[in-house]
Structure formats: structure tokens, C-alpha cells
Amino acid sequence: MKQSKLLIPTLREMPSDAQVISHALMVRAGYVRQVSAGIYAYLPLANRTIEKFKTIMREEFEKIGAVEMLAPALLTADLWRESGRYETYGEDLYKLKNRDNSDFILGPTHEETFTTLVRDAVKSYKQLPLNLYQIQSKYRDEKRPRNGLLRTREFIMKDGYSFHHNYEDLDVTYEDYRQAYEAIFTRAGLDFKGIIGDGGAMGGKDSQEFMAITPARTDLDRWVVLDKSIASMDDIPKEVLEEIKAELAAWMISGEDTIAYSTESSYAANLEMATNEYKPSSKVAAEDALAEVETPHCKTIDEVAAFLSVDETQTIKTLLFVADNEPVVALLVGNDHINTVKLKNYLAADFLEPASEEEARAFFGAGFGSLGPVNLAQGSRIVADRKVQNLTNAVAGANKDGFHVTGVNPGRDFQAEYVDIREVKEGEMSPDGHGVLQFARGIEVGHIFKLGTRYSDSMGAKILDENGRAVPIVMGCYGIGVSRILSAVIEQHARLFVNKTPKGDYRYAWGINFPKELAPFDVHLITVNVKDQAAQDLTAKLEADLMAKGYDVLTDDRNERVGSKFSDSDLIGLPIRVTVGKKAAEGIVEIKIKATGDSIEVNAENLIETLEILTKEH
């Protein structure tokens, strides 16, 4: 493919509005362009990478018997009313009307559509299991699109749905998908973890997320590639090395999710779902009587603890939420933070929002900073973190502005439902008892759910079982964020390329080091001087030879300065660069391996053989 015939609008500078390196490089290297807020055009390079990823998916899904189809993106609202999600999905749902004033949506996901198709066609357990998937654009009206392809209003997704006559059959397919996802992300060159995830708006029960890890850019050996002009990091002057470190640190870590994982076991979970080892304690201290104390100007836990000279772990944090229009009091040990996902899941609520101060005052009779669980109205629902039940003689708000109560004892002074609703902390014991929890940032690239009968129940999707009884179809759901794969790969494979000029100056610039499986082309074939007939002839021969051996070749035939060509090559990030330069008449070319910066000169006759050796090594 001739580079002069492709739309690859590279930029000389990083885009000023980019906050993460993947967004900056996709724009600068000419992979994507923003059409409007949260909506992107995938230019030829990005489209080729996405198509290669689709090929990987199709190959792995064929192995597990998944069949591809295509459903419409424009959906009637009636389907979503059947499932109940039209009212509960929230403001992210694109809603529109046609000329007949009928309600439609742009699909963010397709559970309802696939359920309807199977409901209308499948009547017996003998027709199951079915394993269907599609790859298409989805739509979500993000309030604040950001970080390039990571948070957009239109995005490409693979969504699959499986249909079963029992849960045992679902378990088999779920495990097939888990293994297929691991194979897909491994082939894509991603560093990832499969973690315990939240079903969220999908309504899933068991679920697993696949997170591409986005580590801090502190390891120079990983993030910096030295040109052959620099022997090692030790040769770089200290002041230049500090500049390089600052440049690496300047780009924020893009992972939108925090992962908690064990240092010594396979346990890993999204922070929203992570838990820790919990051991109830036996109360040995005598219970004090309740005492009301004045705490003027104390609005926060740390202010109250300091004023009363107690540790924050001896205080009770009282929060008020509105869950599906009903008030719920949530209690935590004072130095803990609420995990609203855990609370929402426990309550099985569609909506969960923090109460306003006006709502809190109406419920407790006091404002924020003085709320507590003692002497609440009969029938008040109190959900307390399990650690709260270990407290003895704690401090809590008195439900009276400027006052708190000491000597508060769970069980005696209030009744509650005890469940894990806190956010775990680094260094706590893993829930399996092996190792401690550490945190990492990650980008969600895949998610699998056991939906069960959530949609078949609400939409009447039933089959006749072995005994002739009508039973709901059991479902699974399996998603991959196809377009955000591009961002995840670049986040992990961006590199800072450093070289030394003949004058002794050090220069560095960001570029991409694409893994072979996803690179838009395998080889970047560069002609230094397109006016040199010997170079042109050799380039044409090499291009034909490489393509005959199955290499995808991008040939830079542009009449540009060699410096611009090399800069664009570093930006675009193909695994191999072959340069036809001054020694073209002698049949000598240069091979450069992008991942390491290593380069060698070889006879053009030996190019294919040499590449086969080098690609095996790297």
C-alpha cells in the first residue's frame, strides 16, 4: 500500500486538548479525527487495526461455536419498555421519535433485541443452546466525553448473547467465553487481568471484567527506546534523563477503573466489587451509657475525633441515601468510605442517590455532620458495614445540630442489616487469606455476565423443557469494547524514542510500538530519495517480495525529507522499518526493529530470511 494514497494526517505537535497518551498519539499519528464531541472517524490506519482485531475475535469465537449476525442499531422503544429499561437506564440513552411520533432509541446494548428474536423463533429446549454475537456501533449520550476513544458517544462493540435451557449449560458457555477472551486479549498483545466485576445496568448475576492494566510510567527500560546512537541509559546526561522522566510523568494514567488484586493469589476485582478478609471481633469492654456531648463547629469525622480526643476508628459515619425513592441509612466506621455499588447491589435498587441536606434534615431532624443511628423513627432501614458491629462505645451524631453521642453500641442502641459496603484499602488482607491487596489502574476491554432469566422473565421468552413445561430461557451476555482496544493497546505500547544527533544533542519524541497482531501493517518500507531510480527499483522489488511472503507493507513513496519520514514512521508504530537509502545501488538496506531500536544493514537478497529470524527473536 502506497503511503501517498492513504489518508494519514500526522501532526508535528501533540494535540493540546489530549490528556492521555493514547488520545494524543492516535490524533498526532493520523489514526483518528474527532468529528464532534465524543464522536470519531476511524481513518485508514485505525480501521485496519480494528479489522485485525475483529479477525482475532472471529477466529476465537468460531472455536467455541459462536455465530455472527447483525441486528439494527435503531430500536423501537417498545422492546425496552418490555424489559423495564426504557425508564431505568438513565440519561445516557439516546431517545428519538420518527415522523409518526413513535418512540425509538439508538442501542447502547442489545439484550432486548436478541431476546425477542430468540423468543419468537425458539420454542423447545431441543433448539438450544444458541450462541450469537455481532460487531456494530453502539450509542451512549455521555455527559462528558473524554480521553479519546475511552469515553465516547458512539463506539464499536462486540456483544454476544447465549441462550440455554438450564444454568449448567450456561456455565459451560460462560467458561468457553472466559477462555476465548483470554486468548483474544493475549493475541492482541495486552497485559490484562480477569477480575470480579459488577453487572450494573445489564442486570447480570455472576460477572467477570477484563482489564487492560495501565501502569505508571516510571520504568525507563519499559517506556524508553534508545536509538543505536545511544549505547545505554548510563550514557544519557543526568539533566536529559530528568527531562525524560518528566515527559513520561506528564501524561496521566488513563485507566478509569481501579483494580484490587492479591500479591500472592489469583484474587482480583474491580474496586467497586473488591472485598477483604473479615474476622468478627469479640467485645470485651463494658458498655458505657449513652451521653450527649456538644461538638461545636465539628462537621467532619476528623474534626469530631480531634475534638473528643478519640480515634476515627471509634466513630460511626452516618449517611443517607435514596434508593428507588425510599430512604436508606448507611453506616460505616469513621475512617472508611462508602462503596455505593456494593450498597446498590445489596438493596437490588435501580436508582441510588445521596440524599440532599434538606432530605437529611427532614429524616434526622439535623443537618450533615450531626447525623446518627440512635433513636431513629420506627421502621427506618439501616444498612451497616460489617465492621460497625465490632465497635464498642462509639461516637455518632446525635441528630441535633452541633451535638454527638458517646457510648454508642450496635445491637443495644440500634438495629441494622450488616453487610460489606465499604471500599477496601491497599495493604488489607486478600479475602482468600493469601497475600495483601494492591491497587492498579485499568481500562475495561471486556465483560461477561450470567444474565440468568432477567430478560426472559420480563419479556416472556420461554421454551418447553424435557417435561413439556414452559420455562424461561437462561441467558448469558458477553461484550468487548472494540474501539477502546485501540486506546488500551496504545496506552500499553506507547514509547518515548530517544536519539542523539551528530552534534551531540539528545532528542526524544513519543511514538507507538504496535504488537504485530494489531499493527495496521507489518513493515514500513521507506524510500529515502524517491528521485533515485535505483532506490525506486529496489523498493518496488522488495515490496513485491514482502507481499508475496504474506507481509502487509506500507510503502512511503512520498517526496518528503527523510527526517519527516522517520518521524512519521515512529509515530505510526509499525513493528519493522526497512529503509532503502544511499546504498540502494549496492543492494543494501537497513532493517530496524521498532520494539528495541536495534538496526542492521543487510543485502536486499537476504531481507526475507533475515526478517523471519528477527521476528522470531522479537
Curated annotation (Swiss-Prot):
BP terms from Gene Ontology = prolyl-tRNA aminoacylation
Q: Give EC number(s), comma-separated.
A: 6.1.1.15
Reaction(s) catalyzed by this protein? tRNA(Pro) + L-proline + ATP = L-prolyl-tRNA(Pro) + AMP + diphosphate
How is this protein annotated for GO cellular component? Answer: cytosol
Q: Looking at the record's lineage, which domain of life comes first?
A: Bacteria
Pfam families documented for this protein: HGTP_anticodon (PF03129), tRNA-synt_2b (PF00587), tRNA_edit (PF04073)
Q: Where in the cell is it found?
A: Cytoplasm
Q: Record keywords: Amino-acid biosynthesis included? A: no
The record, for InterPro entries, names:
aa-tRNA-synt_IIb (IPR002314), aa-tRNA-synth_II (IPR006195), aa-tRNA-synth_II/BPL/LPL (IPR045864), Anticodon-bd (IPR004154), Anticodon-bd_dom_sf (IPR036621), Pro-tRNA-ligase_IIa (IPR002316), Pro-tRNA-synth_IIa_bac-type (IPR004500), Pro-tRNA-Synthase_IIa_type1 (IPR023717)
Q: Name one GO molecular function term.
A: aminoacyl-tRNA deacylase activity
Q: What is its main location?
A: cytoplasm
| Keywords tagged on the record | Aminoacyl-tRNA synthetase, ATP-binding, Cytoplasm, Ligase, Nucleotide-binding, Protein biosynthesis
Kind of enzyme, top EC level? Answer: ligase
UniProt family annotation: Belongs to the class-II aminoacyl-tRNA synthetase family. ProS type 1 subfamily.
What role is this protein assigned? Catalyzes the attachment of proline to tRNA(Pro) in a two-step reaction: proline is first activated by ATP to form Pro-AMP and then transferred to the acceptor end of tRNA(Pro). As ProRS can inadvertently accommodate and process non-cognate amino acids such as alanine and cysteine, to avoid such errors it has two additional distinct editing activities against alanine. One activity is designated as 'pretransfer' editing and involves the tRNA(Pro)-independent hydrolysis of activated Ala-AMP.
Read off the domain note: Consists of three domains: the N-terminal catalytic domain, the editing domain and the C-terminal anticodon-binding domain.
Q: How does it assemble?
A: Homodimer.
Q: What is this protein called?
A: Proline--tRNA ligase
Origin organism lineage? Bacteria, Bacillati, Bacillota, Bacilli, Lactobacillales
The gene designation is proS
